[in-house]
C-alpha cells in the first residue's frame, strides 16, 4: 500500500477538440493536413508538462485510409490485403519479452475467434520530437493487420471487439499494453507530443499517400504532469472534452447490467469481467460504453442520445413523440452527466454532440470544397471568407452529424425525427407506464404515534430540540432549508466526544475548476428528480414491456404514496420488507449486515422487485442498522452479482430527515426514501404548538424543501438528474475505517481510517440505554449554536472573551490565556491530534526571524463590503496595510476613493458575480484572487439580500438599491481547466504586475486540481477548510460540504512536489486559524502564507451570534444598518494589528522551541510533528500518516515557492504589438486609429492597453481622447476583455468566447467579412458568455451570439442578431437588444436593466424565465418613448455595423415593431428604465 494523500495516477482532464470531414466522403491528404493545422491552432487549450516540451497528449482518429494501408502492408509484410481487413494500432511495452507476450496474447485471442492474423508492421516514428517525460515512457508502436476467416460473415467487428477485450483481460497487469484502435473502419494516431510535432513524430501522417475523408482530433489538458501515452485521445470511437461527474455511478451501473447487454451479436458479453473500465479516464469509460452499444447493434445516434440526452423533463416546447423517446430510454439507462462536448466517428458518420447544459464550445463551418469543420474555436484553419457556405454552433443538448455515404448534413431536428419515429414510444408509454398515485384507502391514512413511543424513537435516532426548531420547522413552515451564518466550529463526527449520526461523517463533494456547478433555481429547466420503479430490461430490444414502469416525480415519498407503492398487486412491482433491526446480544453489526445482504440476494433471485429496507417498529433490546450502511452494503453486493438492475431499494427510515441525509442514501444507491420519523416528529410539533396549520400541508412543504435541498446538493457537483447521481458516492467519508468502507461504500474516499463497526455499534448501544429511560428527555442539541454542556464549539464564549480582552488591551499575557484555551483543548480538529516535537537544543529567540518578516505572510480572508459594514471593512484594510500584511476586498468591489490610500485592499477578489470588477479595480491590485469556491458553501453562489443593498453598495456593484444581488454558483468563464488558464491569462494581460491567486476548497482530489491550476500559470493557491465563515448559507452546506484543510493542504503540497511544480507557486491555507500554533502546523503541512477571516472579525468586536444574514448584527460589524453601525461598532485598527502581532510573536517562540530560525525552514518539515493518542476509541483508530508521508515525492523536490511569478508559455505578442502602436496616443491623449491582423491564437486582445489606460487615468479612461483599433481575421478568446473607456475595437471576421467580458466602456464592434455570402442573423459571429460582468460600454455584433450572452451584465449596452440559451442571466443593469431568435431561459435571475427581443415566430413567451421578469409589447401608445428608444438603438447599430438585418427592420419598422417584446424585472417601473439607460453612457 503506498502512503500519501496524493497518488500520481489521479487526474482530471479537459481540452480542445474537433472533427473535419468531406461531406461526400472524398478522401484526400489535404483533409488530413487541414485537421493537423486545426489541432495546432488549439495548442493553447492543451497543457504542457514541467519539462516544457511534453504535451498532455493529442491525436487523430481517421476513417480507414484503405489504399495507403494496402500499400504499406505490401511494403512491410509482402501481403495483398483482401476485400475486408482490419488494422490495429497498438502500444506495446518497450521490452522484448513483454512485447512478445502482448503480441502472442492478442494473436491467440484473434485466432480463437477464427480470424486470420496477417502480420505486424513497425510504425515509423521520430522520437527526437518528444519531450524528456514522453520519451521516458515511449511505448513500441505497431500496426496489426487482420482479415476475417471463412466463417466470420458479418460478425467481423464483433469478433475483433471480443478478441481485444479478452486479450486486455488476460494482460490486465501489463499497463504498457494498449490497443488504440482495432477496426475495419477507423485507425488511430495519437501520443504525448505537441500538436505541431504530430506529423513529424508519425511519418505516416506526412506521407501524401495517406488519404482520408473523416478525421476526429483532440488536444488534452490534464491536471497532472505524469501523462501517459494511452490517455491521449481520441479513443476508439470518440474524443471527449469535459468531465463526467457521475462516472462512478455510470461505471457501477454499466458493469451490473451485464445481462441487459447480451444480444444476438453479443451473446457472450457476460464473460467479460467489466463492461466498461473502472479505472483510467472518464472519457475512456464513455468510449467503452458507446462501443458496447454499437457492437451490440444499436444505431449510433440512438446510442449517444441515450448516454447523453438533452434536458427533456421540463422543456415545455418539446414535441410529445420526442419526449416519449427520451422517457422510454431513461427507464433502462441513466445519463452520463456532466460537461461533455463529444466528437466521434464510426468510419461512415462524423458526429458532434453537447450535453444538456452546453458547457463546452463547438463552432462549425462548411466551405465550398465540401469540407465541414467543427472545433472548440472558430478560425482554427485558414479559409477564404468568400468560400464559406454556412457556419454555426452546436448548442446545449444539440447534435450535428455528417453521413459521408449519402452526403447529408443532419441537424438536431433531422436526427430527433428519425429517432422518435423508430418505434411507437408514445403509445407504449400511454399503455404501460403510470405515475405513482397516492393511495386513498383508510389503511393509508397517516397514523400518529403515541407520545411515549415517539420519545423513545427520537432519542434512539438522535433528534434534538435544536433539530426540531432549526431544521424541521423551516422545512415544514415554508418549504425552505434553514439558513445560518459563520462557519462550522464543532468537531467533525470522528473527533466528537458525543454520539453523532453516521451521515455526519460524509462530506459532500462539489465541482471546482475542472467542471462547473449549476444554479438549481435559475436553471431548473435542466434539473430532474424523476425516478423509475421496476426492473430494467435489455437495452438492445424495444418492446411495450420496456415501458411497464412506475414513475416517481420525487424520490421522497408521502405516507399515502409509500402505502400505494408497497401494496401494488402487479407482480412487476412485487415487494418484500427487510428489517434493519438486529439483536446485539446475539449478532454484531457487521454480521447483521452480511445477513441482510444474503436476504436481499435471495429476494432479488426470487423475482422480488421492491426491496423495502425498514427500521420502523423497533422493539426494546433491538438496534437499527444505520440506513446508509444497509443501502450501501446491499447496493454493492447486488451490483457485484449483476442483480442490482432487477430491484429497487426503498428505504423506510428514521435516519433521513434533512437533504444531506437523503443525499447520502441516494448517493449510495437508494431508489426512494420514506422518512417515517420526520413525519411523526412534525405531527408531534403540531400537537405541542411548535407548528400551526394543517399537518398534511406541513408534510407537503417539507417534501418541497427537501427537493430544493437535493437539487442544491446535486447541482454543487454539476449534476442535473437524480438518476445519474444515484450510486455515484460523491462524498468523502472523514474518519470511517476501511472495514466499513470496503463493505458498504466501495470506491468512496476515506483517507485516515477511524470509526469501525465496533465503535458504531457501541454508540448505538449507549443511545439505546438512554432511549428506553422514560425520565431521560430528548437532547437540546448544540450542533448549530453553542449550548453549555453539549457539543464543543471552537468559538465558545470563553474563547471570544479571552481574545477580545487581549487585543483590546494589547496585552500579550492575556493573549497567552487565549492561546492556551485554543491550543490545549481536547482534540476538536485533525491538527489537534498532531503534536510538535521540541528540538534537543532550542534556538535563542533573538536568532529567530523578526515579527516584521512574518507579518507579510498573513492575509485577511475575502469578506465583501456588503457582508461587512464599511467601518469594519476599512479597519481591516488599514490594519493589514500598516502591519505589512494584505487585506482582501471580497467580492463586492472597492470604492475608487480608497485606491492608492492606506485603506485600499492589496488583494482584489474576482468572484462569480463580478461585482464592481472594472479595469481600474484590476489595475489597482497587488494580487488578483479568483474565488473558485468558499469554505462554508463550496459549489454554491451567493445572495446579498435587497435590504443590505444601500446606495453605496449599489454604486460599487453597479446595481439598483434595494434589489437582491445574486452571484452564480460557477464562474461562467470557468467550466474547465483550460478556461481557468484563459481567465488567468486575461488577468495577467490587464495587470502584468499583479500575482494571480486561485482560491479552492479542500476535497479529495484537490491535489490534481491544484497541479492543473499551477499548469494554468497561477502564482498562488489558497486551500480553504470546510470551517471557513460565511455571511449566509444553508445549514446543510455549512455542516456537510467540503473537507478540513489538514487533508487538502498536504495533498496539494504532495501533488505539486510529485509533479515538479512546487517551486513555481505559493501555497496558502485558511479556515479556522486562530493562534500561532495553528500557523506552525499549517506551515509544516505545506503552507507558506496564512489567511484569517473569522478571528480578525472577532478581534473587531464580533460576538459570534450567527445572525449576519439578518442585517441586524449587534456589534455593527456585519450590517449595513446605519444606527447599529453608529451606536455599536467599537472596532479599531489597533485591535486587528495587536491580533496579528501576537500571532507572529507566538510563532517566533514556537520556532525557537523547534530549533528553527526561518519560517521557510519549517515548510513541509513533517518530521517535526507526531500523532498523539486521542481521547475516544474512534480518535485512537485514526491514521494520520498520509498527511505526513508520501512515498512518491522525490526527496530533493522543493518545499516552497522559489520564483516571483509563474510566467505563462504564451507571451501575448499581439497585445504587446497593440500597446506599442498606441503608447504615444495613450500617454499624450492624442487619439488615433490603428490597424492589425488577428488569428484565433491572439487571445485577450485589448486587455494590456485597457489596463495601461486604467492604471494611468482611472475609471474615466480616454473618454476625452478616444483611440480606435481595427482588426481583420478571427479573434481568439476574450476579445475586448476588461475594455477601458475611450478604447474602441472594431473586428471584421469572427470572434470566440468571452467577447467584451468585464468591459467598462468604449465600443466593441464585430461584423462579418466583406466577402461573406451568408445571412448574418442566422450565423454565429461571437461565442459563449460574451459581455459577462460588463459594467459599461457598447457591444454591437452583426450576427448571433452563443449561450449566456450578457450574463451578469450591469451596465453595457449591446445589440446582437440572435442569442443562445440563458441570455441576460443575472443581469443588473444596461440594455440588450436581440434582433432575432433566442434560446430558452431568457432573463433568469435578472434583477436590473432591460432588453428588447424580436419574436417573429411567437415562441418567446415559452422561452423566457417567468420568475423575476415580465414582458410588454412595444407597439402600444403608452410605450411610445420605448418605441422611439428602440429605433434609436437600432439606428446606431446599423451605423456602426452596416447590418443588413438592422436595415431590414428599420425599413419596415411599423411591421417589425409588432413582434418586439420589452423584457424588464418585475420590481422595476417602466418609467425608470429609460432614465437608467441614459445615465450609463460609455
UniProtKB/Swiss-Prot annotation:
Enzyme Commission (EC) number: 1.4.1.13
Q: How is the cofactor bound?
A: Binds 1 [3Fe-4S] cluster.
Q: Which residues form the active site?
A: 15 (nucleophile)
Key words of the record: 3Fe-4S, Amino-acid biosynthesis, FAD, Flavoprotein, FMN, Glutamate biosynthesis, Glutamine amidotransferase, Iron, Iron-sulfur, Metal-binding, NADP, Oxidoreductase
The pathway this protein participates in, as annotated, is:
Amino-acid biosynthesis; L-glutamate biosynthesis via GLT pathway; L-glutamate from 2-oxoglutarate and L-glutamine (NADP(+) route): step 1/1; Energy metabolism; nitrogen metabolism
Broadest EC class?
Answer: oxidoreductase
- Induction: what does the entry report? Up-regulated at high salt concentration.
Q: Which residues form a coiled coil?
A: none
Q: Where is the Glutamine amidotransferase type-2 domain?
A: 15-405
Mention one GO biological process in which this protein takes part, according to its record: L-glutamate biosynthetic process
Looking up Pfam families in the UniProt record yields:
GATase_2 (PF00310), Glu_syn_central (PF04898), Glu_synthase (PF01645), GXGXG (PF01493)
Offer an example of a GO molecular function term for this protein: metal ion binding
Q: Which SUPFAM superfamilies match?
A: Alpha subunit of glutamate synthase, C-terminal domain (SSF69336), FMN-linked oxidoreductases (SSF51395), N-terminal nucleophile aminohydrolases (Ntn hydrolases) (SSF56235)
List the cofactors. Answer: [3Fe-4S] cluster; FAD; FMN
Q: Which InterPro entries match?
A: Aldolase_TIM, ET-N_metabolism_enzyme, GATase_2_dom, Glu_synth_asu_C, Glu_synth_asu_C_sf, Glu_synth_centr_N, Glu_synthdom, Ntn_hydrolases_N
Family that this chain belongs to: Belongs to the glutamate synthase family.
Q: Quote the function comment for this protein.
A: Catalyzes the conversion of L-glutamine and 2-oxoglutarate into two molecules of L-glutamate.
Name assigned to this protein: Glutamate synthase [NADPH] large chain
Q: To which species is this protein native?
A: Halomonas elongata (strain ATCC 33173 / DSM 2581 / NBRC 15536 / NCIMB 2198 / 1H9)
Protein encoded by which gene: gltB
